[in-house]
């Protein structure tokens, strides 16, 4: 299928995707129904932490602290047997001088290689972008290739694992990360090339953010984040539900 000129459009504070449908709204019932008995690992920066916050809030698990000093967050939804973990990626540039306890952070590759082996119902979201604008291109490529190598090892043990890449998005020019949007846009293309053929779920939020009725910022408002997570659910729910049906028919 040809890639459309735009990924979708906004109407009444809702993003309508032209590449992913039907949509699964972000709410407690949908999260419990789709992601039951699942371990969700969200790795990345504070923009990925916003996804964690949106999901936990939808589940009624409270709004976690969302500031620059939170590097590890965990929540459990007992009714659906759903475990959520956010892990900040280490060794990246940060706009402020802060102390980081290295025991609370993990490389994406280590998160993948340390996945529980008693179940294949694991989802890993990774999104290395905002803090990597200062990196040499070769070094950033090596970082991605390390993640790819870990995915290949993990999928040999369990082919049903699901891996999700959350793309960069445009941000305001006055952001603490002094890089042009073209750098982050090129990261999107590089990720598609590095992970080609792995069946990776690519949640592309570039056009959604660029076309939103709110001002562009590194940390977009809750309405945008909720629509981003809705797109994530629209990918995950059909895949996980189809596997549930296979289990019930065996």
Question: Where do the language-model regions lie?
Answer:
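A compositional signature for long Ser/Thr(±Pro)-rich, low-complexity
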Residues: 1-250
């Amino acid at each position: 299928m040809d890639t459309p000129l735009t990924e979708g459009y906004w109407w009444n504070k809702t993003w309508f995707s032209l590449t992913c449908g039907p949509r699964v709204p972000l709410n407690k019932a949908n999260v419990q129904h789709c992601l039951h008995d699942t371990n969700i690992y969200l790795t990345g920066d504070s923009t990925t932490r916003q996804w964690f916050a949106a999901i936990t809030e939808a589940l009624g698990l409270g709004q976690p602290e969302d500031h620059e000093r939170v590097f590890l967050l965990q929540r459990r939804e007992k009714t659906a047997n759903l475990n959520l973990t956010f892990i900040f990626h280490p060794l990246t540039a940060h706009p402020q001088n802060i102390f980081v306890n290295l025991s609370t952070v993990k490389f994406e590759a280590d998160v993948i290689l340390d996945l529980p082996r008693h179940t294949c119902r694991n989802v890993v979201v990774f999104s290395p972008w905002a803090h990597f604008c200062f990196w040499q291109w070769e070094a950033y490529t090596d970082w991605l290739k390390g993640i790819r190598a870990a995915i290949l090892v993990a999928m040999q043990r369990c082919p049903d694992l699901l891996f999700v890449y959350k793309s960069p998005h445009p941000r305001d020019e006055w952001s603490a990360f002094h890089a042009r949007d073209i750098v982050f846009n090129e990261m999107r293309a590089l990720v598609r090339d590095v992970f080609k053929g792995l069946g990776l779920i690519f949640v592309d939020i570039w056009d959604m953010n660029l076309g939103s009725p709110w001002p562009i910022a590194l940390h977009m408002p809750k309405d945008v984040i909720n629509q981003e997570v809705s797109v994530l659910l629209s990918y995950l729910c059909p895949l996980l539900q189809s596997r549930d049906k296979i289990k019930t028919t065996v």
